[in-house]
Curated annotation (Swiss-Prot):
The gene is zfpl1. GO terms for molecular function: zinc ion binding. This is Zinc finger protein-like 1. A zinc finger (RING-type) spans 53-101. Keywords: ER-Golgi transport, Golgi apparatus, Membrane, Metal-binding, Transmembrane, Transmembrane helix, Transport, Zinc, Zinc-finger. It is a single-pass membrane protein. Belongs to the ZFPL1 family.
Length: 317
């Protein structure tokens, strides 16, 4: 359990693996919507995380994300594509989290910022609106596509001249349609090769194709601060709160504060008071110990026994 640093100051067991801070659900939705967030106990077990989407093996920061009620994070386009391949008569319980097999739809009686954000995202697609009990929305009409079989060579020449005129006035940036590379995204779940994004840029001179490839790999984050400098400045870093400390660290801190030269008059009076207090306690402790041992030796001393003294006669009068 930890305390979130937001103005609400809520106690939470959620821990952001990227920023290494405790976060509540309000901060999770507003400031950590693309961060890996799980329980703090899981962070103590692993102390590592994978910043990539488990469906397409691409960084989570590259696209819009969706967080389920189990706090697993995916690309919204990947989860939508995966759920769209399910049969139309699939029950709401049939849509499960790809990681933990938990439910995709939040329970109806669950009221939390994460559940509200998830319902808002799911309400934008038909397969999820059916599971949420909402009416379906009409699909937008698909754009008309041209085919090579129904045109002649004269029509193609006319089309090429008109496309050049349009490109001179409004240059366009097009990409491959999502239905062509939808299967390629989910085939990469067992491969480590990155996806290639292809942009077709139409200009007046020629058609240039630019291929952008990004490769990322999860890496551990190490602390590169200067330990000597941070120990002198005594700055409260977030990582220091979760670092293991020796058992007598508090005693060393007290000695360091007592031996510090940058103390004011109030600190000097406090030190004198502590010395006097310890001296009085030690003095009374010594007196009690000496009195106890002295009384015990007097009780066993034969010289102090009146029955063993020849000068003292005790008898019947």
């Amino acid at each position: 359990m930890g305390l979130c640093k937001c103005p609400k100051k809520k106690v939470t067991n959620l821990f952001c693996f990227k920023h290494r801070v405790n976060v509540c659900e309000h901060c999770l939705v507003s400031n950590h919507n693309k961060c890996i967030v799980q329980s703090y106990l899981q962070w103590l077990q692993d102390s590592d995380y994978n910043p990539n989407c488990s469906l397409c093996i691409q960084p989570l920061d590259s696209q819009d994300t969706v967080r389920l009620v189990c706090y697993d994070l995916f690309h919204w386009s990947c989860l939508n594509e995966l759920a769209s391949h399910q049969p139309l008569n699939t029950a709401p319980d049939g849509y499960q989290c790809p990681t933990c097999q938990g439910p995709v739809f939040p329970p109806r009686n669950l009221a939390s910022p994460v559940a509200d954000m998830l319902r808002e995202q799911l309400s934008s697609v038909n397969w999820a609106r059916a599971g949420l009990g909402l009416p379906l929305i009409e699909d937008p009409e698909e754009e008309e596509t041209t085919t090579h079989s129904g045109t002649s060579f004269s029509e193609w020449s006319t089309f090429e001249t008109t496309s050049v005129d349009v490109s001179m006035s409004n240059p366009t940036l097009t990409s491959l349609p999502p239905h062509q590379d939808g299967e390629h995204i989910y085939n990469n779940r067992e491969q480590s090769a990155p996806n290639n994004t292809v942009f077709n840029m139409v200009t007046t001179s020629a058609t240039d194709t630019v291929t952008i490839s990004t490769v990322t790999s999860p890496r551990k984050l190490y602390d590169t601060r200067d330990l000597g400098h941070s120990a002198v400045m005594q700055i409260d870093f977030d990582d220091d709160k979760y670092r293991r400390r020796p058992a007598l660290n508090w005693f060393a801190q007290v000695l360091k504060n007592c031996t510090s030269t940058k103390k004011k008059t109030l600190a000097l009076k406090h030190r004198i008071f502590l010395l006097l207090l310890f001296g009085v306690i030690g003095f009374f402790t010594l007196i009690i110990i000496m009195a106890k041992f002295g009384r015990a030796s007097a009780e066993t001393d034969p010289n102090l026994d009146p029955l063993l003294n020849p000068n003292i006669r005790i008898g019947n009068m």
